[in-house]
């Protein structure tokens, strides 16, 4: 019987993701913003605003991020609680900045148990300013990261996330290039280095928008999200607003999951959240949005729903989920053990993602 090309592609994807179905993998985003006097950090003394919220004090204390001993403990906790990989926020300002945390990872023994990937946090819509600057970033990513054995691969391809695809495409056009040309240039650099093409994921929200319409054309292989604040089309419970409780935020995330798994043209790494409460950094525009931080019990239900979808859709999710975040203390998105919350959120991860894949979620 002849197999149509589209059907063949889906069969190949399903075959490649059989291991995903057997063992869904959960990762976590890591914000490298907790070292004094570091260009790119929230301030010269980034811990100071957090100290007004003593329940958020890390169990390790107000540490100097970038020390290998700190990263060793982080990785030990991750591995012990079934976090398979960590995604470091990657910043480029003509040179890498806030790279101290990933460098500590690379120097640690724990990297053997927890893989890593990069998310290019391209908040700056003026970068790259030139092709040579972009080429410098490509060289840094290749030489400092993609050649490493512990870098996260899916179907044999290293995973790179781009937080704001629209900004990158705007810079592509500003440099006088065709749509998707910077991503093509990145892939060309990777091939010339003798490495397999990247699996580049686009940060996106649900519904038809510029990113979900153009991602495949631009050269992306799938979608992800760092975080969401509302549901599909910016609505929470039918109103144009952000969530005002974790229950609402969980509902909002599930609405994005449903849309992507049902309608998106590319795979979708399932995003999860421990919550949102930005009061240490001045608070959200809608103050009630800062009531969206989770209890361990609420977070457990969120994890269970995500795991169920990852098991049901191994090809569409690539068998991957990623939590925001390990340590976004200023935004209230963290699962790193703290004085006030202990390790209860991590224990929830272990309870849910440590369960046998062949069984029902706990």
Where are these regions (language model features)?
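Bacterial N-terminal signal peptides
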Residues: 7-17
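Positively charged n-region of N-terminal signal peptides that target proteins for export
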Residues: 1-5
């Amino acid at each position: 019987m002849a197999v149509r090309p589209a059907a063949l592609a889906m069969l190949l994807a399903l075959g490649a993701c059989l291991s995903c179905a057997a063992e869904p993998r959960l990762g976590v985003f890591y914000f490298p913003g907790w070292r004094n006097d570091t260009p790119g950090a929230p301030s010269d003394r980034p811990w100071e605003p957090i100290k007004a919220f003593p329940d958020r004090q890390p169990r390790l204390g107000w540490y100097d991020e970038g020390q290998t001993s700190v990263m060793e403990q982080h990785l030990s906790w991750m591995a012990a609680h079934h976090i398979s990989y960590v995604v470091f926020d990657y910043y480029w300002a003509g040179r890498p900045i806030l790279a101290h945390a990933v460098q500590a990872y690379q120097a640690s023994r724990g990297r053997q148990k927890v893989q890593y990937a990069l998310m290019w946090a391209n908040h700056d819509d003026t970068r790259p300013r030139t092709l040579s600057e972009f080429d410098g970033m490509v060289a840094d990513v290749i030489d400092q990261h993609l050649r490493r054995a512990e870098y996260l691969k899916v179907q044999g391809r290293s995973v790179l996330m781009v937080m704001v695809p629209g900004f990158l495409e705007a810079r592509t056009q500003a440099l006088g290039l065709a749509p998707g040309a910077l991503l093509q240039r990145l892939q060309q650099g990777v091939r010339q280095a003798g490495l397999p093409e990247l699996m580049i994921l686009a940060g996106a929200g649900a519904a038809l928008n510029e990113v979900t319409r153009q991602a495949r054309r631009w050269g992306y292989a799938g979608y992800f999200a760092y975080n969401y604040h509302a549901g599909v089309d910016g609505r929470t419970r039918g109103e144009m607003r952000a969530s005002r409780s974790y229950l609402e935020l969980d509902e909002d995330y599930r609405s994005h999951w449903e849309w992507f798994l049902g309608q998106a043209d590319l795979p979708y790494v399932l995003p999860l959240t421990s919550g949102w409460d930005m009061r240490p950094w001045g608070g959200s525009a809608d103050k009630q949005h800062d009531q969206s931080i989770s209890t361990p019990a609420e977070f457990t239900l969120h994890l269970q729903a995500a795991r169920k979808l990852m098991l049901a859709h191994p090809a569409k999710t690539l068998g991957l989920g990623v939590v925001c975040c390990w340590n976004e203390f200023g935004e209230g998105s963290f699962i790193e053990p703290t004085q006030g919350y202990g390790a209860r959120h991590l224990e929830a991860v272990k309870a849910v993602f440590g369960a046998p894949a062949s069984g029902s979620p706990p």
